[in-house]
Every structure is written in C-alpha cells, then in structure tokens.
C-alpha cells in the first residue's frame, strides 16, 4: 500500500520504533514494536484480501462514488503532506504512514472486520455470541487447557470450552472498571477524567452493562499471569472546534503555560496541571492564513479547502481539512477587542490584567521570531492583532481506553508473576494475548506519533497470536 502511495520506506522503521519507546518512557518492550514495524504490511495485505470490493484511494480526500463509499474505502491519512510540514524537523513528529477505513456505516471499518469474520466461519470457526469469559482452566503442568464461559442469552448456563492448542485472550481493555483503574491508572480517577468505557459510550453488552471491564485481565491474573505495570490511558486531547491546532493557550489566571505546539496527549498533561484543569485557546481573524503552517498531527487542522470546492464527494470530510466558512461558528467566544473577548471568557480584575499582558508578551515574541518563554517554533507563532478575536474553553478530555494488559512479548506469550522461587518469569503455556489485553505494547502514555497505531498492533498481533497458538510457538 505504501509503495502504491509513494510512501514506501518514507520513514525508517527504527526511527518509528525508537520514537514509540521514548513516548512510553522505555517501560514497554521494543521487541513487540520492532516485529510489528517490520511485518505489519504483510498482515495488512492479508487483512484486506478478505474484502475484494474495497476501493483503495490515492489521496486522503480522493473523489469516490456513493456506491464506493457505501461499500468501503481505504485512504492514506494526511496525504499528500501539507506544503509546510516535514516530520523530520518536528520535536513531536507525526509519521506519514497511517491509513484509515471509511464508509457510510456508523462503525466505519466494520465491513472489513465482518469480511474476515465470515471468512473464518466459512473455514469452520464456531462463534458464541452473548457469552462472558469467567475462568481459565489449567492442567497439572500449568498449561492453559480451556475456558469457562457464561451464556447470557441462554439462561446464564456455563459452558466449558476445551482447547486442543491453547486459548487466545482478545478481551479488550479495563477502562470500564474503576477498581482496576484506581490501582493501575489512579490519576484518571483522581482527575475525574470522563471515562467513555464506564459511561457506556463505547457500547453496552447483551445485559445492558458498559464494556471494557477487564475480564481478560482478571482471568489471566487469577491463574498467575503477570499484569503489566504502568498502564497507558488513551487521553489525547482533541481540542474544540479548531481541534488541537497550536494557537495561544491561557489558563484561568491569564497565564500562558506551555509550548502549544505539542500533541494531544501532552496537551492534556499540561491542562491537568492548570487551575480547575481549564484553559482557553485564542486566535484571530487570520487563522485561515495560519493553518497551513500548523503540524499535521492527530486532531489538528493543517489544510484549507478552497471555498468553491464541490462538497458532494462522499469522501469530502476529514478532521485536518476545512473551508474557512465551515468554521464560522466553531468558537465559544467572539469579540472585536481582546479585553472584551477575555471578559466573555470570565477574566476580571488581576486575571484580566494578566491575560492582556500575556497576549502582549506573546505578540512581542511572535514578531521577534523567537519564543524565549516556551520554545514554540517561530513558524507557528502568530500575533493576535486582527479582529475579530475568538476563544474556546478547554477542560480535560475523555479517556477512550486504558491500554495495559497481561505482560507479553513479540510472540503473544504471557508470563508468570514475579516469584523469588522462579526469577526467570516462566511463559504460561497455552495462553496467548492480543488486542488491548496484550500488555507491554505501550506504557505510561499512549503514543500518538503514528495515528491508528493501536488498531494496527491489534490486527497484527491478532494474526500472530492465532498462528503461534496453532503452531505451539
């Protein structure tokens, strides 16, 4: 695919892997990321083979027919790259190697998932719907030999499934369980971060309860599997109507508090340190001229669409592209003077004076071409002096998932807990993991230098787990 798009070897795989390790503070396993980076393309090709009706686009917003969009398309993200963006010159790069399935379906990529499921069923796979895993089974040698499930749609009867080769856990994350979150990611609970899993925003199960409850984590831990330390909450901020585009940010005291040109996860971290976990994004009437100089990162605007461009293309919409007119109402506050704007935001007294002084200082730095206060790239420093002025209030973001499962490796193995009697940390025979219950992929923070990386590792290691389980690797 990347060869088709002219992106073959555009990023060295070790550059990507090393960046991912840094963003996770080296508490994850490089071997997992390296194997994925070297071979993910092979599994992606296999994955889409199941759906021959897929239309592969050459650019992010290539014109397609409604029929093509209804059946499903695959697009390269941020391609072609913005004229003024080169990831190699960025402190926080977003690598141009991501792609996205799109369709008229609510679940977007559901068509290719269903195609692979149907292929498995045709090959003899048996499915059990509405069932909950409750317990893993082991033999006297410690090998996992099966699982007990509860069939919620048939009188809650329990069924024992015996495994000739092994058991693969693909049970998702644990963000919907507050007890697990308090232990492994307490800052999410302490900061009262909105939890999409616990709130049922990611769907509910057949009993009407929220999902992402850590069932696989529990089942593994109950038989002695080591749970990964330092879970990684996926709390990357997506901003407001203007996304996370790096315009000026002030806290409630009127102070500028960061280099705004950082990714959404780092933005969230900084906002959580501010009074009331609140900030204001400010920009002026010339924002449309400034957007093309902004980074092509996750959640930010960096392309301006001509006003006369036809919008009938089903593949027209993309988060990084906008017409200026499309953002005419994408603000919370608007005024012809900065003082009036800040007053609307709630600033008064000393905080108002501080905010005005902060903007004056920012304007001086922008004109001088050097951010001596926070080190923001000069090419993204734009003085606020063109009315009308706009502002959006930000709070904390929502957590999509909390990534951190059973400790694993590049072969999807699981390992025993630390034990002075067995310091070598034995592999648990017959138990494999993939998806968000596979630990050691990320740690501390979810990295966003490559968009969609969670899905990519889920697909890749789902394939590896299946192959290795059958082969007894």
Name what the model sees in each region.
Residues 150, 163-164, 169-171, 252, ...:
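Short, well-ordered coil/turn residues at beta-beta hairpins
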Residues 27-32, 50-64, 226-230, 258-259, ...:
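A short alpha-helix-loop-beta-strand transition element characteristic
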Residues 213, 217, 223-347:
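An anion/pyrophosphate-binding glycine-rich loop and adjacent beta-alpha core
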Residues 154-157, 162-237, 449-451, 455-464, ...:
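Glycine-rich loop(s) and the adjacent beta-strand/alpha-helix scaffold that form part
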Residues 159, 297, 307-311, 404-473:
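C-terminal structured subdomain/cap of oxidoreductase catalytic cores
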Residues 1-55, 59:
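Redox-cofactor-proximal catalytic regions of oxidoreductases
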Residues 36-157, 178-179, 366-386:
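Conserved redox-cofactor binding core of oxidoreductases
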Residues 135, 348-445:
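A glycine-rich dinucleotide-binding beta-alpha-beta segment and adjacent secondary-structure elements
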């Amino acid at each position: 695919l990347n060869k088709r798009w002219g992106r073959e070897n555009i990023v060295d795989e070790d550059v990507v892997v090393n960046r991912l390790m840094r963003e996770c503070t080296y508490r994850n396993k490089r071997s997992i990321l390296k194997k994925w980076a070297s071979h993910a393309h092979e599994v992606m090709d296999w994955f889409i083979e199941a759906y021959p009706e897929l239309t592969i686009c050459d650019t992010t917003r290539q014109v397609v027919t409604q029929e093509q969009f209804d059946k499903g398309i695959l697009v390269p993200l941020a391609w072609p790259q913005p004229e003024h963006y080169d990831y190699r010159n960025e402190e926080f790069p977003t690598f141009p190697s991501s792609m996205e399935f799109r369709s008229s379906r609510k679940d977007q990529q559901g068509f290719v998932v269903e195609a692979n499921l149907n292929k498995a069923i045709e090959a003899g796979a048996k499915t059990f719907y509405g069932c909950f895993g409750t317990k893993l089974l082991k033999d006297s040698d410690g090998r996992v030999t099966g699982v007990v499930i509860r069939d919620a749609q048939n009188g809650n009867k329990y069924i024992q499934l015996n495994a000739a080769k092994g058991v693969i856990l693909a049970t998702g994350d644990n963000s919907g369980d507050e007890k697990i979150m308090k232990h492994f990611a307490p800052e999410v609970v302490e900061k009262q971060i909105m939890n999409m899993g616990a709130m049922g925003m990611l769907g509910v199960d057949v009993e009407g309860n929220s999902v992402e409850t850590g069932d696989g984590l529990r089942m593994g831990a109950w038989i002695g599997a080591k749970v990964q330390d330092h879970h990684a909450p996926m709390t990357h901020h997506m901003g407001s109507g203007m996304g996370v585009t790096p315009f000026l940010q002030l806290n409630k005291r009127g102070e500028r508090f960061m280099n705004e040109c950082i990714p959404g996860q780092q933005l969230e971290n900084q906002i959580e340190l501010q009074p009331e976990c609140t900030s204001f994004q400010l920009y002026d009437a010339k924002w449309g001229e400034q957007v093309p100089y902004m980074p092509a990162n996750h959640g930010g605007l960096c392309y301006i669409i001509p006003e006369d461009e036809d919008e009938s293309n089903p593949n027209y919409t993309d988060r990084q592209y906008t017409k200026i007119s499309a953002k005419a109402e994408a603000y919370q506050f608007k005024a012809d003077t900065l003082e009036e704007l800040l007053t609307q935001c709630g600033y008064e007294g000393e905080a108002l004076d501080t905010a005005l002084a902060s903007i004056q200082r920012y304007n001086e730095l922008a004109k001088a071409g050097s951010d001596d206060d926070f080190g923001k790239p000069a090419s993204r420093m734009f003085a606020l002096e063109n009315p009308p002025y706009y502002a959006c209030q930000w709070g904390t973001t929502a957590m999509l998932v909390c990534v951190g499962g059973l400790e694993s490796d590049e072969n999807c193995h699981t390992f025993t807990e630390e034990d002075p009697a067995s310091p070598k940390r034995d592999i648990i025979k017959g138990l494999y993991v993939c998806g968000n219950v596979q630990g050691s992929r990320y740690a501390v923070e979810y990295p966003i230098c490559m968009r969609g990386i969670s899905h990519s590792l889920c697909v890749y290691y789902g394939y590896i787990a299946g192959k290795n389980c059958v082969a007894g690797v």
